[in-house]
A protein has these predicted regions:
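Short, well-formed alpha-helical segments that are part of the catalytic scaffolds
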Residues: 7-29
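Glycine-rich, basic loop-to-helix element that forms the pyrophosphate-binding segment
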Residues: 45-61
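Short aromatic/hydrophobic "clamp" motif used to bind/position activated sugar donors
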Residues: 66
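The conserved acidic donor/metal-binding loop of glycosyltransferases
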Residues: 70-74
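Conserved donor NDP-sugar-binding/catalytic core segment of glycosyltransferases
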Residues: 80-110
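A recurrent flexible, glycine/aromatic-enriched loop bordering the glycosyltransferase active site
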Residues: 117-141
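Acidic donor-binding loop at a coil-to-helix junction in glycosyltransferase catalytic cores
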Residues: 156-162
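Catalytic donor-sugar/metal-binding loop of nucleotide-sugar-dependent glycosyltransferases
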Residues: 165-182
Length: 193
């Protein structure tokens, strides 16, 4: 198994999860990757913390690489194909670029990399403010390194703490330059995964 895609969800988000799974399955089929990509989902009704759910998923994964997709976000049509191509480099992690919106409003580009600190700054490359973030749960990373970092047993900012724990283990990286992910923060939905 090359890649484990891990998704935390809530019972009340069945429709959003179904849309995401349809897109993931379409991409797996179009890449002829069903033998090398697994999708593992953990759905509950907030019985355990998001961090505990993420750790359960990490422990169930068999892929050499793992990445999380939030059930209320969107992936671009080339997401899986580009990650599978990048995996061939055998780097510790894969730097990615995406779009961040609040309530599907103004689009802001973000970039994830082991080489960044968490900061927002102007990028001449994109002629706009870009959210530069260290590698986090959305970053495809070798599973063995994610297992060393693990998530704290909490539902708020567990991804940020995981990022701080993970980054010291990351020595090598390959970059996907194309947009692959759309993170849409919903100000009206305070439910955690």
């Amino acid at each position: 198994m090359k890649l484990s895609i891990l998704i935390c969800s809530l019972e009340k988000r069945k429709e959003q999860l179904a849309e995401l799974l349809a897109e993931i399955n379409l991409q797996i089929t179009s890449c002829d990757a069903s033998a090398i990509v697994e999708v593992i989902i953990e759905v509950d009704n907030k019985q355990i913390t998001t961090g505990a759910k993420r750790n359960n998923l990490l422990n169930k994964a068999f892929g050499k690489y793992i990445c999380f997709i939030d059930d209320d976000d969107h992936i671009y049509p080339n997401y899986i194909k580009l990650i599978l191509e990048a995996i061939e480099s055998d780097a510790d992690c894969i730097s990615t670029t995406g779009i961040y919106t609040v309530d599907n409003g103004r689009k802001v580009r973000w970039k994830l990399s082991k080489d960044y600190q968490d900061e927002n700054k102007y990028s001449e490359e994109f002629n706009q403010i870009v959210y530069f973030r260290r590698a986090n749960h959305l970053t495809p990373v070798k599973r063995e390194l994610a297992l060393q970092a693990m998530f704290p047993d909490q539902s708020n900012a567990e991804d940020k703490e995981y990022s701080f724990r993970l980054n010291p283990f990351l020595k090598t990286e390959v970059e996907i330059k194309e947009l692959v992910y759309h993170y849409d923060y919903r100000s009206y939905d305070k439910e955690y995964h």
